[in-house]
Amino acid sequence: MGRIISYCNISTDADNLVGLYHSLGMGYPKFFKMDSLSRAGLVAAEIVLQKAGLRNDDPKPDMSVVLVNRSSSTCNDVEFQKSLAPDNYFPSPSLFVYTLSNIVCGEIAIRNRILGETSFFVQEDFSPEFMAEAIGWAFADKAIKYVLCGWVECQKGRQSCMMALVENDGRAIEPETLESLYK
């Protein structure tokens, strides 16, 4: 069930991600409070939705979000763990909230007024078969016409994303199509 409307691939460090944010004219100050995973997902979603001609202030009750990665929220978990150090025990609530990997889905949904279901899965590696199946699960809800999906990873200061907007055209999305976007 699906036709790719738009997609992007990003592989960058935190500084370049901020540059992308500025070049997109996002004007979303909350971006600077987010963890790296959420920043990467938000920028990738912005690129994909802008390419598709969708405005972030229009409600999207017919769209869902499906994201996958390998490391869950490990990047931010490490930072949060540092705030628990015995000699400096001041856990940061702003770090804690991002120790949940599905927060990136919520950030994307809030920014873009996506009102459908959001799902985040952790897989050992990118699996186009799993992604195609998860897109199918989202389209099982007859109200959903679009799925914003992707692989969003953050490890060792690098963020990488493959994000795509899939439209339900009544045919199954081929795993090979998703694989070609990931490369």
Where in this protein do the model-derived segments appear?
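Conserved "HGTGT" condensation-loop signature of ketosynthase/thiolase-family condensing enzymes
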Residues: 1-144, 148-183
